[in-house]
Regions:
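N-terminal pre-domain/capping segments
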Residues: 2-149, 170, 177, 216, ...
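Acidic/histidine-rich catalytic cores of soluble enzymes
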Residues: 53, 84-85, 176-272
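A structural motif
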Residues: 82, 152, 244, 278-279
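Acidic-and-aromatic substrate-binding clefts and catalytic sites of carbohydrate-active enzymes
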Residues: 88-100, 124-128, 163-167, 198-204, ...
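Helix C-cap/helix->beta junction micro-motif
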Residues: 110-111, 150, 188-189, 217, ...
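Active-site groove signature of glycoside hydrolases
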Residues: 147-166, 189, 194-198
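Conserved active-site loop/cleft motifs that coordinate metal ions or position small ligands
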Residues: 280-287
Length: 308
C-alpha cells in the first residue's frame, strides 16, 4: 500500500491523534503526543578514530592507536549515559555480514542504548535515466535493510549536489522522485528517511519543499543545526523542526557570505526544539578537528541537562 503522508494524517485525525482541524493542501508537521528529547552521539564525531572509512582503511587513523569500531562506539555511548547511538555508515567494515548488524543491535540492547539511526552519503539529484541514480537508490535501499537489522528507526539521506548539466529545479525534482521511490521500500521496513539540509539545501524553504513534494509519512527532515546558510539560521531551524524525524546538533553555525563559522548557541537550539514540539533524538555530531574524547563529554553533559 502506498500510503501518502497526507492520508496518514487524515487517519491519525480520525483516531484523535492529530489536532481536530482541516488539513491544508500541503503536508502537515508530524502530530506528536510526547515531548521527550533523547540525547545521542553520532559516530561521525570519532571519524578519525575508526579503522575503516567509506570502505577503505581510514587515512586519518593513526597506527598504534586502539581503533574505534561500532560495538566499541555503542559501549562508549552507554558509559556516557546516552539514550542513543547514531552509527554512521561510512565507518562500518567493508562487506559486513548480517551478523555484524544484528550484533550491534544486541550490544546496544544489553547496554541500554538505542541505535537511533544511521547515515548515508548518497546523491539523489541524478536524472532518471542516469545509471548513477539506479546505483544511489540501490545503495540507500541496502542501508534500509541494514537499519532494519539493527533496529534503527531512521536513516539520514541527502538530496545531493547538482550533477553537471542539471539545473537546480531539475535536480530538486529528481531528488523528490528518488526519495518517493525509496520511501516505499523504507515504509515496508519501518524505517524513516530524514532528508538533511546539506549540499544544495541551505534553507528551510527548499528543505520543506522537498519533504512536501515526497508526501510520505516515512520521510521527514533530518535537521542539521550547522548547515543552514541564511541571515537568521535559528529562524530556519524553527521552521524546519516541526517536520523533523531526527536532529543532528553541531557546535558551530555557518555565516552567510563567509567561509567562517561561529559558535552555536546550543541551549537556544534545544529551546527551539522544545518550543516547536519536537520529540525524538538530539544527536551531537562533533565536527571540530579537536580530540573528541576530551571535548565531546562536556558538551553531552550540558545537552543532557538542557534536554531533560
Amino acid at each position: 500500500m502506498n500510503l501518502s503522508r497526507r492520508s496518514w494524517m487524515t487517519g491519525a485525525l480520525g483516531l484523535g491523534l492529530a489536532p481536530a482541524s482541516s488539513l491544508p493542501a500541503v503536508t502537515e508537521p508530524y502530530p506528536r503526543s510526547g515531548k521527550a528529547l533523547r540525547v545521542g552521539l553520532a559516530a561521525y564525531s570519532f571519524r578519525n578514530h575508526f579503522e575503516w572509512s567509506r570502505g577503505k582503511k581510514n587515512p586519518k587513523f593513526e597506527a598504534g592507536e586502539k581503533a574505534m569500531d561500532m560495538p566499541g562506539f555503542i559501549e562508549y555511548c552507554a558509559r556516557l549515559g546516552l539514550d542513543g547511538a547514531e552509527l554512521t555508515s561510512y565507518f562500518f567494515p567493508p562487506d559486513c555480514e548480517a551478523s555484524y548488524f544484528t550484533d550491534c543491535r544486541r550490544i546496544a540492547h544489553v547496554n541500554g542504548v538505542q541505535i537511533s539511526g544511521t547515515a548515508v552519503g548518497n546523491n539523489f539529484s541524478h536524472p532518471k535515466d542516469a545509471p548513477e541514480r539506479v546505483e544511489q537508490i540501490a545503495h540507500v535501499k541496502q542501508w534500509i535493510d541494514y537499519a532494519s537489522l539493527m533496529g534503527a528507526p531512521h536513516i539520514r539521506v541527502f538530496a545531493g549536489a547538482h550533477p553537471k548539466g542539471v539545473s537546480p529545479e531539475d535536480a530538486e525534482q529528481n531528488a523528490i522522485d528518488a526519495l518517493a521511490e525509496t520511501a516505499v521500500y523504507a515504509a515496508e521496513k519501518g524505517v524513516f528517511l530524514g532528508i538533511e539540509n546539506h549540499d544544495s539545501i541551505t534553507t528551510a524553504d527548499r528543505l520543506l519543499r522537498i519533504v512536501r513534494g515526497v508526501d510520505s509519512p516515512w520521510v521527514g527532515v533530518n535537521l542539521d543545526s550547522g548547515n543552514f546558510i541564511a541571515d537568521d539560521v535559528y529562524a530556519e531551524m524553527t521552521a524546519s523542526a516541526p517536520y523533523a524525524v531526527n536532529v543532528q546538533l553541531k557546535t558551530e553555525i555557518k555565516i552567510k557570505d563567509s567561509k567562517e563559522k561561529a559558535p552555536a548557541d546550543l541551549e537556544r537550539v534545544v529551546k527551539i526544539l522544545k518550543d516547536t514540539g519536537y520529540a525524538g533524538y538530539v544527536v551531537l555530531e562533533f565536527e571540530e578537528e579537536t580530540d573528541p574524547y576530551e571535548h565531546v563529554p562536556p558538551i553531552l553533559e550540558k545537552l543532557q541537562k538542557w534536554c531533560g
